[in-house]
Amino acid sequence: MKITIARECGCYGDEVGQVLADRVNVPLYNKKTLTELAKKKGILEHYPDYFGENPAGTLLAVIAEDDGEDSVVHRTPRKVLDELIGETSCILIGRAGNYAYQKENDVVRVFLSGDRESRIHHLMEKHKVKRHEAEAIIEKTEGRRKQYHTYYTGEDWGYAANYDLCINDTRFGIEGTADIIMQYVKDCTAQEK
């Protein structure tokens, strides 16, 4: 079982992911851990844009948007993830995981959102920055995530139909959000039997 978590900037994606990983005793992969794994396996230099979140704006990005679902660029997320984590059960934060595993039955694709004010305050606390800096982080990060996701998937980032479950983590908190995801996984597993 894989659970992929995409999220708006300032949501508790890493924290929710860690709670889930601890509960089901599987590894948590995010940009940092995947980048470290790619370095160890010697593939980081082959996919610098995939680990960067800034491929858009290049000529290749424009071509990739119109190159069809089976383009080399659109296959990159799955190819990289297969090389790094294979069939391992895990929690995967970002990296277009929802797209990479969209055709798999044993995957739950989650998108976390939150009210802007809560996300700003979370970033202010987490990064010890002022309000205007947190707002700038949100704008810059979300712009990059949208471009990154479109570049690698041809899909709109955050569009509900691309996920199995969309949750406002502001309403439920970290533990409550993890509870909802776990209940969804449990219900899906029960239906498959």
Predicted feature residues:
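Short, polar loop motifs at secondary-structure junctions
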Residues: 94-98
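Conserved phosphate-donor/acceptor-positioning beta-strand/loop module used by diverse small-molecule
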Residues: 103-126, 131-141
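Short beta-strand-centered segment that lines the nucleotide-binding/catalytic pocket of NTP-utilizing
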Residues: 27-39
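Glycine-rich phosphate-binding P-loop
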Residues: 4-18
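ATP-dependent small-molecule kinase phosphotransfer cores
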Residues: 38-89, 129
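Small-molecule kinase domains that catalyze NTP-dependent phosphoryl transfer to phosphate-bearing small molecules
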Residues: 56-58, 130-175
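Short, amphipathic alpha-helical "lid/cap" segments that border enzyme active or binding sites
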Residues: 78, 174-182
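Short loop/helix-cap segments at secondary-structure boundaries that form the rim of catalytic
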Residues: 99-105, 160
